[in-house]
Curated annotation (Swiss-Prot):
Residues 30-238 form the MARVEL domain. It comes from Mus musculus (Mouse). Belongs to the synaptophysin/synaptobrevin family. Glycans are attached at residue 213. This is Synaptophysin-like protein 2. One of its GO terms (cellular component) is synaptic vesicle. The lineage of its organism: Eukaryota, Metazoa, Chordata, Craniata, Vertebrata.
Length: 264
């Protein structure tokens, strides 16, 4: 009985042993260093950035009161959200004529380019920082011994810094345009029924932009995190060591000459 059960037990233990070895190989103390700690912040705020922008949805609206008694107050509610292709969002404009009831209208504007670029950059930042954390925690010796890894990490960090600045600024401008296009006043201004004397239009639901405003804030926080991390990544590159060697070279030579003079 013992001989038949031993293979099953060893097969059950082998995956656990592999997981234990993997966890034991992780050097969690690296997270206390700036290089690892900032990567954790970059990973978290990348989630906050693309999550707050990509999950946003809001609504705007207006009220139309026809002067004719045959018509009641019409409430218009328009739902919109990411990726903010507002020209594809439809709503029904009531008509105060006796013959017709409503007319299909569309919001104006397409702000998908800055929004999608912002979300895409956040997703790429999420995956890159997660991969970088694995290298820092599990393969840090390879990272320090191989000079290519710090150089690649530095170049990628500088690139992400630039892209986050562009993405946050572009999405901030795009969000301002989205607010202008989805205001209730913009909705009533686009409806022809509100320009005549046969109806009275007033503002309805006002869109709440709190989550969208946070996404812009998270974008600039990501920029500052990546910009600050450039220095710590640069310190791991051979370029930083060369600069120190060049700075210490003349001082060491002058110290040696001074020692020789004192001996004489």
């Amino acid at each position: 009985m013992s001989s038949t059960e031993s293979p099953g037990r060893t097969s059950d233990k082998s995956p656990r042993q592999q997981v234990d070895r993997l966890l034991l190989g992780l050097r969690w103390q690296r997270l206390e260093e700036p290089l690892g700690f900032i990567k954790v912040l970059q990973w978290l705020f990348a989630i906050f950035a693309f999550g707050s922008c990509g999950s946003y949805s809001g609504e705007t609206g207006a009220l139309v009161l026809c002067n004719n008694e045959a018509k009641d107050v019409s409430s218009i509610i328009v739902l919109f959200g990411y990726p903010f292709r507002l020209y594809q969002v439809q709503y029904e404009m009531p008509l105060c004529d006796q013959d017709s009831t409503s007319k299909t209208m569309n919001l104006m504007g397409d702000f998908s380019a800055p929004a999608e670029f912002f979300v895409t950059l956040g997703i790429f930042s999420f995956f890159y920082t997660m991969a970088a954390l694995v290298i820092y925690l599990r393969f840090h010796k390879l990272y320090t011994e191989n000079k290519r890894f710090p150089l690649v990490d530095f170049c990628v960090t500088v690139s992400f810094t630039f892209f986050w600045l562009v993405a946050a600024a572009a999405w901030g401008k795009g969000l301002t345009d989205v607010k202008g296009a989805t205001r209730p006043s913009s909705l009533t201004a686009a409806m022809s029924v509100c320009h005549g004397e046969e109806a009275v239009c007033s503002a309805g639901a006002t869109p709440s932009m709190g989550l969208a405003n946070l996404s812009v804030l998270f974008g600039f926080i990501n920029f500052f995190l990546w910009a600050g991390n450039c220095w710590f990544v640069f310190k791991e590159t051979p370029w930083h060591g060369q600069g120190q060697d060049q700075g210490q070279g003349p001082s060491q030579e002058s110290a040696a000459e001074q020692g020789a003079v004192e001996k004489q």
